[in-house]
């Protein structure tokens, strides 16, 4: 059995995506977010939000052995040495940027690791904007007065954070 086990090939193989291609996908990601949301309002929420929403996100790309910091409000995408929130393959980050359902899919398939305390929750507060958009919830002035939606979002975020701490 040892020989058979050693002969097994890895099930999940990822393609390495070069950093320049990821950067191009990020530009499309920014355009998609900005076309569905009031970016000025997103900036205001980011500045005054008690839950630290829409902050820059730091991801370590395992196969490229670099960390990137991105901010769809400022449209910035840079390499960094700051502590990452999550770690994943370059193909997974590129998938998030190319698909409006990308982060949702990643949370289901689990192709990432949390590398800092509360890293997943912090990343979710930034990346979940497209999950909301896919549900027909855009960040616009009228959304601020839709208290059931705000309550739903905060309740789900709290549940996820509580489960991760357990």
Task: Name what the model sees in each region.
Residues 1-166:
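Feature captures hydrophobic
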